[in-house]
């Protein structure tokens, strides 16, 4: 390679790095803006939870970006998984959903996933497994959850799910609460004393997990939850404090592999 070719290649690589850094910045800004949008009021938070209820395999930060770009997404995966494992080709012209990965290692970068709606089947194609609960599954699913979280007192399935979700949150919320207190500065939570901070976090987390579980299981959350029970979301007014709530809410409390039946 000549010196001129080396200089040209180096210029191309530098330009590419700048372009990628700019795209990463734009996606990061999108995540922050979406975090602000979904904590402005209860309706925004519920809209996010509706999407998150279908995306339990993803971390909160990724759920947030999927919601920002494709709120109607039902099953997302990388192109390689669709092509090689599922035998489904991504349709021409489909726009990938950008996710930020590698931040925990100090090397953040963008990776892209595609919703099943952006794919088409080819010979030997597999349908993605979409978690669904029908009425005949209530008893075995509730029994499986109660074996993990303890028996409840409620008889009606939706109320039993509410009770189970509250028990599950009580097991995990303390581990997230300490870190939340460190990051409360600059948010509406900053003015809360320790007791009120804990109450707000626990109650908002409980209602959020209940809403998500009810939605995932085909119930209408408004039949069991009032908007007032989710009103605490407006206190999580910075991305850093929302991050703690979102991570706690997206913990895999209830996933198909934890249950005794497959649908």
Model-identified regions with their sequence ranges:
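N-terminal accessory/interface modules of nucleic-acid-binding and processing proteins
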Residues: 2, 8, 14-263
């Amino acid at each position: 390679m000549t010196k001129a070719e080396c200089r040209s290649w180096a210029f191309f690589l530098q330009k590419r790095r700048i372009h990628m850094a700019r795209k990463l910045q734009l996606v990061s800004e999108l995540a922050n803006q979406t975090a602000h949008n979904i904590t402005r009021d209860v309706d925004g938070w519920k809209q996010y939870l509706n999407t998150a209820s279908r995306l339990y395999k993803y971390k909160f930060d990724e759920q947030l970006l999927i919601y920002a770009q494709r709120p109607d997404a039902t099953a997302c995966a990388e192109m390689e998984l669709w092509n090689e494992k599922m035998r489904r080709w991504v349709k021409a012209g489909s726009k990938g959903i950008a996710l930020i990965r590698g931040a925990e290692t100090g090397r953040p970068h963008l990776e892209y996933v595609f919703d099943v709606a952006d794919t088409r089947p080819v010979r030997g194609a597999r349908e993605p497994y979409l978690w669904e609960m029908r009425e005949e599954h209530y008893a075995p699913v509730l029994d499986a959850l109660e074996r993990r979280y303890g028996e409840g007192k409620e008889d009606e399935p939706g109320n039993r799910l509410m009770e189970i979700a509250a028990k599950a949150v009580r097991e995990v919320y303390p581990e997230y609460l300490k870190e939340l207190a460190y990051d409360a500065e600059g948010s509406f939570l900053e003015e809360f004393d320790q007791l009120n901070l804990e109450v707000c976090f626990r109650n908002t987390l409980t209602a959020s997990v209940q809403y998500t579980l009810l939605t995932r299981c085909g119930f209408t959350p408004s039949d069991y939850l009032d908007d007032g029970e989710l009103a605490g979301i407006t206190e999580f007014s910075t991305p850093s404090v929302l991050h703690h709530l979102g991570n706690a809410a997206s913990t895999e409390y209830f996933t198909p592999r934890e249950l005794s039946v497959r649908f």
